[in-house]
Amino acid sequence: SEQLHESYKASVADNEILKDKDPSYRVLNLNDPWQDTSTSYYHKSIGGYHAAKLRRYQELIDHRLSPEYMSTVQSLQKAKTEEDVMAVFASTTSLNMLNMRYIIYNPTQRPIRNPYAYGNAWFIGQVQIVSNADAEMKALDSLNPLETVVVDKRFANNLIGFVPQKDTTAAIVMTSYKPNVVTYKSKAVSEQLAIFSEIYYQPGWKAFVDGKLTPH
């Protein structure tokens, strides 16, 4: 409605981000992101609020995203040069994994663009099997998500027989995005393991590979 739109009037930062027509990025508003709802009015937001929380994602917020958010705020407050700012994002691996391309630091100013965002999907070269979900979370403290995926041993059977092979020509990109349909296009000369920058939620979703319904 017009009243709602007025309540969420676009800021300078919002308008600048909206110039980017790529469907694949996310935005982090540094103004209390886990309670903020305004960012989601215009953008795919890393933050936001809902009373009914997905437990696994909430654990990711508590153990990885919130500490990286706090570190980002503190580091930006101390940064004196553009190099200082860019160095901040090199270490925010979990936020980069969620494809954080833009950061709203001051709504009245242009957003900060993060050159380290991983994109909406990528292929990895190593698989690390761990004992449980807690070990998965702990592994995120040290692994490079662009190179390695960590997998709970409960799902190890899904990878039987798969050996990652380096393919420098392999690529996977999002071609369209809707709340209930996300489409990707990929190319590779050998079998690859794709990592998607999404929250896994099985009920209601179906996966298709080359048009064929595929278990997920």
Task: Map each language-model feature to its residues.
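Extracytoplasmic
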Residues: 1-53, 112
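Flexible, solvent-exposed extracytoplasmic
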Residues: 18, 48-63, 67-216
